């Protein structure tokens, strides 16, 4: 799939899943906020960039803990849903349409730049991480949260095959070592990391992606048994000069 075809697939799938995304994110907002508060220990003065924000799951979770959030996505439908919620509940959250690999912001304008469950949806994750790094100031931090590829590459290959059947916008899961290498390549030092297991009901997981009809049958035929995903959290900062 070319970059243009992948971009079209991403927009189509997320545009069709807006209501399900909003409902899912609202159901876990308080849990995510508690995780963010513990992991980031925000001061309340941060200006935060959320790249690949979707309808605002992370943006709205972190908003009460910081000064300002700028949420970026490429899908107009999810941006519209996010803006509507921001106007009602979170005046310190702004939604901007932009490409995660080419952000329209000046260097060093944010205290924290985050990519939350975003990297497995992009064809060039190294460009996105480079943009996150460019966007933070000298004392800024980068947060990456994503599902981690299994250590066994054959298991990872089969898992990516299922994920693409479920959601054509999926590219590939990155191994833990790749995420660490991307941060290191941009001059960042990993300050904190952790992993946890997330059990997934396959039927509900397919529903969330709007996977139906023949697509659903194919995805079910290759779905992992007792699907448990490994989720990694990575917090990095610039190396001291």
PLM region spans:
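Short alpha-helix
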Residues: 172-186
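Conserved Class I S-adenosyl-L-methionine
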Residues: 28, 186-241
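Conserved class I S-adenosyl-L-methionine
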Residues: 1-44, 57-61, 81, 143-165, 203-207
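A short glycine-rich, Lys/Arg-flanked "PGG" loop and its adjoining helix->strand segment in the class I
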Residues: 126-138
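Class I SAM-dependent methyltransferase SAM/SAH-binding core
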Residues: 49, 55-102
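Short catalytic micro-motifs in class I SAM-dependent methyltransferases
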Residues: 117-118
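A conserved beta-strand element that flanks and buttresses the S-adenosyl-L-methionine
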Residues: 114
